[in-house]
A protein has these predicted regions:
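Terminal non-domain segments
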Residues: 1-50, 167-171
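Low-complexity repeat regions of mature extracellularly deployed or surface/particle-associated proteins
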Residues: 33-171
Length: 171
């Protein structure tokens, strides 16, 4: 995939991410719990009822997680990495970054977004109600199934998108 196509796909993915977060924050109902964890050189875990967040990072890295409405968010960063895990209204998201930037967000019941990268400068994994999405390095690739999902890894050029019925995948 040439650089122009990769950039265009990255910009499109970024636009979709912003739109998804705008819709999710604008249309949500009151949540059972809102939790925020952040870490630089530490490990922070908060559990309240059915909601939980965790952020862990070495001194050169930063991790944040945000949870609303019985979600779970986990972020783990090492080697100068940045990661964010956002679980909203029943979603479960986990991001593990080594030296790059990784964002994982899951919105709605039954949604799961998992990401782990060692070499990517930027990767994103999003999942909507009933969706299952994962991103990793080249050996893992991008996985989209179930409900609405979006995955992209800029280092490998791998990505996928699912509307819950059909799935599109980049090599």
């Amino acid at each position: 995939m040439d650089r122009r196509k990769t950039r265009a796909l990255g910009l499109a993915a970024g636009g979709m991410i912003l739109a998804a977060f705008g819709l999710s924050f604008g249309s949500g109902t009151a949540s059972a719990a809102t939790l925020d964890c952040s870490a630089r050189g530490q490990d922070q875990t908060i559990v309240e009822g059915a909601s939980a967040c965790r952020a862990v990072a070495d001194p050169s890295s930063y991790a944040i997680s945000h949870v609303e409405g019985d979600g779970v968010g986990v972020a783990d960063s090492r080697d100068g990495g940045r990661s964010a895990g956002v679980g909203l209204f029943g979603g479960v998201a986990a991001a593990e970054s080594r030296g790059g930037i990784l964002a994982a967000a899951a919105y709605g019941p039954g949604s799961l977004a998992l990401g782990r990268t060692d070499s990517s400068p930027f990767a994103v994994v999003l999942s909507g109600p009933g969706g299952r999405a994962a991103v990793g390095d080249a050996d893992v690739g991008a996985i989209c199934s179930g409900g609405p999902t979006l995955v992209f890894n800029i280092a490998t050029g791998q990505g996928c998108f699912s509307d819950g019925t059909s799935t599109w995948v980049t090599p």
